[in-house]
Amino acid sequence: MLIIRETRMRSEKYPSELLENAVEAISSLPGVGEKSALRLALHLLKQPVENVRHFTDSIRLLRENVRYCRTCMMISDDEQCSICSDNSRDHNTICVVENVRDVMSVEATGQYHGVYHVLGGKISPIDGIGPSDLKIIELKNRVEALTESGVEPGNIEIILALSGDVEGETTSFYIYRQILAFGIKVSSPARGLGFGDDLEYADQLTLGRSIVNRQLFRP
């Protein structure tokens, strides 16, 4: 009886079940509440069918066909992303970040010309995320491949550009311990960012300066 009552209340709230379904789907996106979802759904109703079809096809194709770079785990249309395939970049300097958004944030500064490594998160026992759930082994393999290719360890730099909260610091320390034996340079951005701030929310000027003025990592 409870389910029937809830269904009846919801159907009375919206003049169309199709509209209700669209609002439910849109509101499932992060940061989108029911009111915003309704506004977006009504906006889509006013658009030409071809525009809406292009919109939905773009999302579907993204989900079905997007790849992750085999080298750095960045989103890519091909097996290797445009950054890793760019010979003008410094491939001996690897900036380690938590997610794809962080790469985009650092790139937007125009101050960094190395390559990246996307971990896919940070160590968080509360959330059930351990080292094996992140791309840490892949990072070690990249460093090992560089040393085996003849690059002097002193010419290899890993920048630990993770968030400054407890989980981010824990992840940075863990990675540092894992790559310490290679004898390479390990650094971190100058702390112009507040404690616990994510790179995504840092302004470009502050973030750019923190990358340029990076310091040796001190556990």
Give the predicted meaning of each segment.
Residues M1-R8:
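N-terminal amphipathic/basic-hydrophobic helices that include classical n-h-c signal peptides
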Residues R8-M9, K13-Y14, A145, S149, ...:
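Post-transcriptional modification and biogenesis factors for structured RNAs
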Residues S11-L19, S28, L38-V103, L216:
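Cys/His-rich Zn2+-binding cysteine-cluster or related metal-binding knuckle/ribbon modules and their
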Residues E20-E24, L38-L42, R53, D57, ...:
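Solvent-exposed alpha-helical segments within well-ordered globular domains of core cellular machineries
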Residues A37, D86-A161:
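Extended interfacial segments that mediate partner engagement and assembly in macromolecular machines
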Residues P48, Y112-H113, K140-T147, G154-P219:
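Long C-terminal interaction/binding lobes of large macromolecular proteins
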Residues V52, G128-I129, G168:
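Alpha-helix N-cap/helix-start motif
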